[in-house]
Amino acid sequence: MALLTAKTFSLQFNNKRRVNKPYYPRKALLCYQLTPQNGSTPTRGHLKNKKKDHAEIRFINKIKSMGLDETQCYQVTCYLTWSPCPSCAGELVDFIKAHRHLNLRIFASRLYYHWRPNYQEGLLLLCGSQVPVEVMGLPEFTDCWENFVDHKEPPSFNPSEKLEELDKNSQAIKRRLERIKSRSVDVLENGLRSLQLGPVTPSSSIRNSR
């Protein structure tokens, strides 16, 4: 497996709200680990966006090409620099529904267009389809650093300090994701409340009108 350079990890998994000078594009990068339930050696790799395909679509195609044994279960963990867009979220849900022997977990360093309703709905769609989406914290950044980065040459930064910095920055992003997830809980609670209250009668409608 080709490994990431320490510089690529530092730049692309950078989860600061704003990039410091000199500015650079924070690209979509996906690191995946496929672990068979029988205890065999995990398969790892990483993918990035290409002109026509997002990293998530390339990941789906990569897993399909492996010809996995459908009688065996696999744990799949993905570390993404950006959370999936709505289109990719839908594709991932369809993929997992068609491949019940795969258990997919997604961890993102940053939330992509998190303020847009359709991007929030994409995240909720994944979570509601048994595809957990979480923000990367210290355990995930550490695992990504240890298993997907080439350590032949010493990095230009202190790895421990970098990982602690990433974990510190992730706290606000985690709270942001929890607020998004709470929307689905609110919608469900409101729906149940409406069912319990039953239809609004004409008289009550008049009393509650403004």
Curated annotation (Swiss-Prot):
Residue ranges the record marks as coiled coil: none
Residue span(s) of domain CMP/dCMP-type deaminase: 4-126
InterPro entries linked: APOBEC/CMP_deaminase_Zn-bd, APOBEC3H, APOBEC_Cyt_Deaminase, CMP_dCMP_dom, Cytidine_deaminase-like
Biological processes per GO annotation: cytidine to uridine editing; defense response to virus; DNA cytosine deamination; innate immune response; negative regulation of single stranded viral RNA replication via double stranded DNA intermediate
Disulfide partners: none
GO CC terms, sorted: cytoplasm; nucleus; P-body
PROSITE patterns with a match to the protein in the record: CYT_DCMP_DEAMINASES_1, CYT_DCMP_DEAMINASES_2
EC supergroup of this enzyme: hydrolase
Catalytic activity: a 2'-deoxycytidine in single-stranded DNA + H2O + H(+) = a 2'-deoxyuridine in single-stranded DNA + NH4(+)
Protein name: DNA dC->dU-editing enzyme APOBEC-3H
Native species: Macaca mulatta (Rhesus macaque)
Taxonomy of the source species: Eukaryota, Metazoa, Chordata, Craniata, Vertebrata
